[in-house]
Amino acid sequence: MRKLFFTLLIISIFAVSCTQSDNASQVPEGEYIQWRSENETADALVLKGMFLYMNVEQEMAYTYFKSSLDFDSTLFGSHVMLAWMSPPSEVKDMHQKNARELVKGKNENSNLLVSFFDVLPGDDLRARRHKVWSKMYEIEPDGRFIHYYYAITKPTLEERISELEVLLERQKNDNNFLGVGHILNRLGYFNYGLGNKAKAKNYFDQYIKAYPDGYNAYDSMGDYYSNEKDYENALSYYQKSLDRYPANRSSINNIREINDLKAGEE
């Protein structure tokens, strides 16, 4: 079974890499985070892992980043992402240690990414993270991963929305490999947080159209309907998410919570 899964994974990697734009297939010049690998398979795994992570499909993203290290063990960025996705454990500590060691000699933005290990939970966490992202954005404003986190860590929802709208237009215009789905998703949640419910739903609709094969887009629409207490539609979208990825913990938990709530009302 494991051999079959790995074979299917590799097939999907090359299918993705063949459809990527020329810009994605070459390492760009500039002070970008140095994620990339000279190994073609490792590089495709990293790019796909980034795409999945940005779309909050972390269960799958973890597999891609972990597999990238099988082809290139020097990828500090993969260790960073695996550490971020791991609970406190020896495994998390191992990934942090490897990232700190492997980033030596890399550019400033790569080292700043690793420095987030030292931005510990506590008061003003968002502001402290934004300070680092702001420095990274100042160094390389064209870095789309950097720009996204620079945007979503801004102080207010209004500021985050405004900056994400700027990024959305950039992504639409240059066909960046990360796409626009993750931006549409976040704009949906942020607008809902401000009470702009119609606008939020429109963004979630756009997200599904932009990424119809993903599972998080349907989970997000399920959240919209759940927050509106339209539980039948919520269950429908959570199930659509599970149809695309049966191990999605968010949809599994949300379906359980809604069913428990409905049972309590009977």
Predicted regions and their residues:
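Short coil turns that delineate tetratricopeptide repeat
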Residues: 39-40, 73, 104-107, 140-142, ...
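Helix-start (N-cap) detector for alpha-helical repeat units in TPR-like alpha-solenoids
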Residues: 42-43, 76-77, 109, 144-145, ...
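Register position in tetratricopeptide repeats
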Residues: 54, 88, 121-122, 156-157, ...
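Canonical positions in the second alpha-helix
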Residues: 67-68, 98-102, 135-136, 167-173, ...
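Canonical tetratricopeptide repeat
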Residues: 81, 149, 186, 220, ...
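Alpha-helical adaptor scaffolds
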Residues: 115-119, 149-217
